[in-house]
């Protein structure tokens, strides 16, 4: 549903979706770290009553805990609310990205070492711009910067097998 589809009263408060996979569905193979590492198209839609100054996205793999002993961070992205609605996390040049657990800045696709894993995409609408956030930030730095500033959050999950 988009703003064009109805009035503000009928728009969900804050949702995250992907054009590449449905909630709980299979993330495309070419989005995998070793199979093209293509960013999935992630989109945020929100009710205009949320006057967010910025948005953040965290993609991680809680299933990695059993394989590597930690929740693996695959993507950290932050962007100001300076683009047309809906907000997309695939437009280069308007995002500040953090460092993944692969040691790289930007998107690092699924790479489960053992079995099918579930990946969690968490989106946050933020009250203010996190102007001090610099490229290469960690998940902890992003979470610390967002503390007390989250207006709304949404979650999308997808699976990927080796």
Model-derived features: positions:
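N-terminus-centered regions that define maturation/targeting leaders and the start
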Residues: 1-162
